[in-house]
C-alpha cells in the first residue's frame, strides 16, 4: 500500500466533481487500499477519491473508537437519498483545506446508498459523526469544499492566505 499525496485547495480537481465508478477491478481495489493508508497516515476520518487526484465517486471512512484496527468502510458511487432530523452545526476540518476549521451545518441523520468494494448494494443509515463524515466526503465528490460552506469572511480570509503563500512560493523559485 502507498500513502498518496493529498490534493489541496485551490486545485481544480477539488471543484470538478467526480464520475461514477463503472468497473470494480484490481486497480480500484488498489486505490481503495492506498486511500485507506493515506487516510490513516494523515489522521483523517474520511477521504474522497478526488482528494487523491482520482475523479471517481468513491469514499472511505472510519469513525470507529478503535481506529488502530483500521476497519474502514468503503462506499462506491455514494448518494445521499434521505435526510432526517434537525440540522447540526459542528466544527469541521479537511485534509484538502489545511489550517481551516469552520462550523458547517449538516443533517443530523442521513441515508446513503451505494455499493461496497465487492459491488454489493449498500444502504447506510447514519447519524452523529458518521452522518457528518459521509456528507462531508460526498460534498467532495460533488465539487463542494468546507470552504464553500464557511462564512463569507472566513472564506475570503482563507483565500487571501492561500494566495499569499502561492505568491511567496512563486517568488522563491
UniProtKB/Swiss-Prot annotation:
CDD domains to which the protein is assigned, alphabetical: Pep_deformylase
Annotated active site: 137
Any one biological process term the GO annotation gives: translation
The keyword Iron appears for this protein: yes
Catalytic activity as recorded in UniProt: N-terminal N-formyl-L-methionyl-[peptide] + H2O = N-terminal L-methionyl-[peptide] + formate
Organism superkingdom: Bacteria
InterPro entries: Peptide_deformylase, Peptide_deformylase_sf
Cofactor requirement: Fe(2+)
Residue positions binding Fe cation: 94, 136, 140
Enzyme Commission code: 3.5.1.88
Enzyme class: hydrolase
Co-factor: note: Binds 1 Fe(2+) ion.
Gene3D superfamilies attached to this UniProt entry: Peptide deformylase (3.90.45.10)
Keyword annotations from UniProtKB, A to Z: Hydrolase, Iron, Metal-binding, Protein biosynthesis
Gene Ontology MF terms: metal ion binding; peptide deformylase activity
Job description of the protein: Removes the formyl group from the N-terminal Met of newly synthesized proteins. Requires at least a dipeptide for an efficient rate of reaction. N-terminal L-methionine is a prerequisite for activity but the enzyme has broad specificity at other positions.
Membership in a protein family: Belongs to the polypeptide deformylase family.
Protein's UniProt name: Peptide deformylase
Naturally occurring in which organism (per UniProt): Desulfosudis oleivorans (strain DSM 6200 / JCM 39069 / Hxd3) (Desulfococcus oleovorans)
Amino acid at each position: 500500500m502507498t500513502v498518496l499525496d493529498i490534493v489541496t485547495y485551490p486545485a481544480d480537481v477539488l471543484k470538478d466533481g467526480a464520475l461514477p465508478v463503472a468497473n470494480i477491478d484490481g486497480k480500484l481495489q488498489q486505490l481503495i487500499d492506498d486511500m485507506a493508508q493515506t487516510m490513516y497516515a494523515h489522521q483523517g476520518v474520511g477521504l474522497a477519491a478526488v482528494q487523491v487526484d482520482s475523479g471517481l465517486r468513491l469514499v472511505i471512512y472510519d469513525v470507529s473508537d478503535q481506529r488502530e484496527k483500521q476497519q474502514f468502510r468503503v462506499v462506491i458511487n455514494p448518494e445521499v437519498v434521505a435526510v432526517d432530523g434537525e440540522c447540526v452545526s459542528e466544527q469541521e476540518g479537511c485534509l484538502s483545506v489545511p489550517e481551516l476549521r469552520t462550523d458547517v451545518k449538516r443533517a443530523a441523520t442521513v441515508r446513503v446508498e451505494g455499493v461496497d468494494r465487492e459491488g454489493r448494494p449498500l444502504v447506510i443509515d447514519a447519524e452523529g459523526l458518521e452522518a457528518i463524515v459521509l456528507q462531508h466526503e460526498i460534498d467532495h465528490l460533488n465539487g463542494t469544499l468546507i470552504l464553500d460552506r464557511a462564512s463569507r469572511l472566513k472564506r475570503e480570509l482563507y483565500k487571501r492566505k492561500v494566495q499569499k503563500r502561492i505568491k511567496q512560493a512563486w517568488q522563491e523559485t
